[in-house]
Each structure stands twice: as C-alpha cells, then as structure tokens.
Amino acid sequence: IGGNAYTVINNVTALQAMSSGLSGKYALGSDIDAGATSTWNSGAGFAPVGTYVYLNPAASFTGAFDGLGHTISYLYINRPSTNYVGLFGGTSGSAIIRNVGLVYGNITGNSSSMISSVGGLVGYNEGGISNSYSTGMVTGYFSVGGLVGENHGTIENSYSGGTVIGTIGTGDVVGGLVGINEVAGSISNSYSTSTVNGTDYVGGLVGMNFGTITTNSYSTGDVTGAYAVGGLVGDNYASIINSFSTGTVTSSGGYVGGLVGKNELAGTISNSYSTSTVNGTDEVGGLVGINYGAITANSFSAGVVTGTGYDVGGLAGYNDGIISNSYN
C-alpha cells in the first residue's frame, strides 16, 4: 500500500496479534467476525491493542492500520476495571487508522475511573483517523465516545452509531462520536447517529470540546443527561463551525441546549444550527443553554424548547456573552 509492505490480517487471532507489534503496518484482507472474543480471557474478551502511558509513546500503537473498506463485527471487550479501552487502547501521534468499520461491537471500559477513556475504535487517540466508523454499544465512566474516548489527534470523514452510555448515575463527559476532544483535537466532516446517555457534560457528537469541530460535522441521535447537555456538544470551550444537530435533547437539570449545553467564555459557535427538540429544567435554549462565549455568523435554532424552571429561550436560555447575526 503506497509502496509500503503491510501485514495482511484475515482473522481475529491475527487481529489480536497486533499487540505484539505496535509499530507495524497492518491491513485487513477480508471482513472479520470477532464474535469468538466473547469467550476470550475468562469473559474479558479482546485485549485492546496498545494503551496510553504518560511520556511513553512506545506503549501505544504507533503504526498504521488500513481496513481497506472491510469490517470487524461483534468485537467484545468487557474490562470494567481497565482504562484506555477500544479496539486500540491508545494510539500515538504517528499512528494512522483508516478505512475500517467496527460493527455490532460491545465495548465496556472502566466503570469508576476519572481517566477511563473508552471508545469503540480507540480509547485514547493522538493519531489520525479517517474514513472509519463504529456501531454497537460503548460503555464507560468518564470520557466515553462511540468512536473515540479521548481525542488529541485528527478525526475526519468518520462516524458512529448505536448506543453510548456513561455509567448510569455517574458517567460524565460522554459523546456520540468522542467523549472529550482536547486542545489539539480536530473533528471534521464527521457525524454521529448514536443514542447517548450520561450524567454531566453529555453531547450528541462530543461530550466536552477544547479543540475544533468543523466542516459539516453533525449529530442526529437523541441525547439524555443531567447537567450541560447538548445536541452536538455538552460543554464547549473552543470552536464549533459549520455544524448542526437534529436529535431530541433531554436534561433532568440545567444548562441544556439544542446544539450546546454550556458555551464557555472561550467558546465560539458560527454558521451552525439546531432543529432539536429540547427539554430541560433551567437554562434551556434552542441553540445554547447558557452562553458565556460567542454565537455568530448566521447560527440559528428552529426546534421546540420546553423548560420547567427559569431562563428558557428560543436561541439561548441565559446569555452573558455575545450573540450576533443569529436567530431563532
């Protein structure tokens, strides 16, 4: 591929063997049925390839993985005491993952740790992910996403579907595509149709955003949480550009918005919109629940908004920031 030699993988045993060569180049030669992993390791299932260790990139997957358009189905991981869980537990900045679909997976990571980082495809990503997707169920405690748990790299032309669950009653920073998108993280032309359930900082695409979300990224799934719940992003500290949400957003608490639950002081929203139906208690808005940042450049909301408490608005529930050239 591209003049480089790749190891061809045609079965789930060879897929697991990537753990012994984290710097290698791999390609799928066929679709892989990974259903047998449900009986592996005394019920713990597949062992994630690579992990994240601070200042030790060699512990992560550093190579290349090209699915060549093939799928991996019924992958099973049940590791409720393990951080950095996914097909790939951790990837370094040099890693490349592309052209692969993970379908009907059942992925469970740490159910009590604040650094759990659980994703269908990658738990902790510093590399590049493109033209890839994940469907099925993903469950964890903190930083949980349908495709990636914690993103420090690039995600483009990718999507997630299925169900993403933050541990019931306690699961925070939960997103349909990505749990937390960090400062260096970039998401473009990607989307989620996932149903998302969590407690705080819950979003249809991203639970908490410190990076960039742009180029027609969107969410259509239903989102349910308690605090800082948004159709696209739960809590936004950075840039959302040319993006939208359409799913139903429901919160049992405050800071709930069709697009963003809480837009922080550094948060900017431009050329983005929501047609979501929004239901909450306090600080409920068609676009943003509570705004401390900037909403600009033809951003709008067009959904039905219902709040049972105070600060309920068609565009923003409560505004202490800048709103210009935007409407509902």
Language-model-detected regions and their locations in the chain:
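Surface-exposed repetitive/solenoidal architectures
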Residues: I1-N328
